[in-house]
């Protein structure tokens, strides 16, 4: 693992989550959350960001998927923030559009230590696979606030909910890749001198 890597665990009465992340990877992943569609989305994120990612989770799925998905977002966000360290030499910003058939999605990121989420997407279905569509925004909110990033996600247009969610995760991965890439200098990318 590189110097930009982290391992985080979160154990509560509702869930047990373990995340390993290496920002300087090649997109390898091993994902087992107990929620097949989320596994697919996290695999796509890893591949598109080129971040190596292992996620193992067990949760109270007999209740619903909320606790598991939110806790994965929290733990992944914490690991991401820890992996970045003091943020010397990163680009800081990343923006990417991804088309998927009839859908076009946008992700824009500022690794600013100013957590915020703007999420603009409507879903027609209650679930895609075993994953509640209402949990898409909850995952990204948990990630953004624990990673300390400003994250804007928008589906500009589209019909199929699977395509919308997949395009969002791919765009998110590509924007992360751009934001965490090393710039030509080793400065902190802020006039304040810190992030």
Swiss-Prot record:
Look up the EC number in the record and give it: 4.2.1.19
Q: Where found, per UniProt?
A: Cytoplasm
Which pathway features in its UniProt record? Amino-acid biosynthesis; L-histidine biosynthesis; L-histidine from 5-phospho-alpha-D-ribose 1-diphosphate: step 6/9
GO CC, one annotated term? cytoplasm
- Pfam families in alphabetical order: IGPD
* MF GO annotations: imidazoleglycerol-phosphate dehydratase activity
What superkingdom does the record give? Bacteria
Question: GO BP, one example?
Answer: L-histidine biosynthetic process
User: Which key words tag this protein in UniProt?
Assistant: Amino-acid biosynthesis, Cytoplasm, Histidine biosynthesis, Lyase
Question: What InterPro entries has UniProt attached to this entry?
Answer: IGPD_sf, ImidazoleglycerolP_deHydtase, ImidazoleglycerP_deHydtase_CS, Ribosomal_Su5_D2-typ_SF
User: Its family?
Assistant: Belongs to the imidazoleglycerol-phosphate dehydratase family.
What is this protein identified as? Answer: Imidazoleglycerol-phosphate dehydratase
Which species does the entry assign this protein to? Clostridium beijerinckii (strain ATCC 51743 / NCIMB 8052) (Clostridium acetobutylicum)
The gene name reads hisB
